[in-house]
């Protein structure tokens, strides 16, 4: 789970946006500028990323669900891959307005998606060619829009977002519902309202990979820790029972 300063440096996490596009509220996290590009202070970014990982790890160990969001072209594939590795829901194509605030309707669409997938597996021979074409088109659209959250049965316990400005609707919905936000915030965006800010480059593919992998690792470590605790508790109970049997036998 541990990420080093060198790894952040090599991934280009420190490269912000052009100075003329900066958000003054990011000033505490900016080291300076070079060639009219803001340089983000990695001495701030590293511990803040580690804090975000600790939060996610604890949440996962308690059985919480983290929704990973990254719909920008350079983030889609990585976010989907890391979310699947960690076994958590994700949004990698586009954020549908109301995905959180109107989750009841979204659940209806999820039900429809699952029914259609089952129908496809059973066979579409009874349909005409035209009906099959329309069916497949609808299924592909649903899969693209909500495929990543089809196993999310309730609202997530936290949301991880790469580029809070690009995903402002997702951020607004989470804030409205009081869902904790873990967000990568570049020099041109506002960090206010983000519970766990990760100051850093939100455009570099290498940086995006580092964030997504780090959060996925934290989720997996949290689950593993919880499982270890369960095993320890179970073995402790069986040990007590064994001692009692020994005593009664004596």
From Swiss-Prot:
Keywords: Ribonucleoprotein, Ribosomal protein. Gene3D superfamilies: Glucose-6-phosphate isomerase like protein, domain 1, Helix hairpin bin. GO terms for biological process: translation. The keyword rRNA processing does not apply. InterPro entries: Ribosomal_uS2, Ribosomal_uS2_bac/mit/plastid, Ribosomal_uS2_CS, Ribosomal_uS2_flav_dom_sf. GO terms for cellular component: cytosolic small ribosomal subunit. CDD domains: RPS2. Pfam families: Ribosomal_S2 (PF00318). The keyword Ribosomal protein applies. GO terms for molecular function: structural constituent of ribosome. HAMAP family: Ribosomal_uS2_B. Belongs to the universal ribosomal protein uS2 family. This is Small ribosomal subunit protein uS2.
């Amino acid at each position: 789970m541990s990420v080093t300063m060198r790894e952040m440096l090599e991934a280009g996490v420190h490269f912000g946006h052009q100075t003329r596009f900066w958000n003054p509220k990011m000033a505490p996290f900016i080291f300076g500028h070079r060639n009219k590009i803001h340089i983000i202070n990695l001495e701030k970014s590293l511990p803040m990323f580690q804090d975000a990982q600790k939060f996610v790890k604890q949440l996962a160990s308690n059985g919480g669900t983290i929704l990973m969001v990254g719909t920008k072209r350079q983030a889609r594939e990585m976010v989907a891959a890391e979310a699947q590795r960690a076994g958590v829901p994700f949004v990698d194509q586009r954020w549908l307005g109301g995905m959180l605030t109107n989750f009841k309707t979204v659940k209806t669409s999820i039900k429809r998606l699952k029914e259609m997938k089952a129908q496809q597996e059973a066979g579409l021979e009874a349909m005409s060619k035209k009906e099959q074409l329309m069916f497949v088109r609808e299924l592909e659209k649903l899969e693209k829009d909500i495929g990543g959250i089809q196993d999310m049965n309730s609202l997530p316990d936290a949301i991880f977002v790469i580029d809070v400005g690009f995903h402002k609707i997702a951020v607004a919905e989470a804030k409205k519902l009081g869902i904790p936000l873990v967000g990568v915030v570049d020099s041109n965006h506002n960090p206010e309202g983000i519970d766990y800010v990760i100051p850093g480059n939100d455009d570099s593919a290498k940086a995006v990979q580092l964030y997504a992998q780090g959060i996925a690792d934290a989720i997996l470590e949290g689950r593993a820790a919880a499982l270890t605790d369960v095993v320890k508790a179970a073995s402790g109970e069986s040990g007590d029972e064994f001692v009692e049997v020994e005593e009664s036998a004596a």
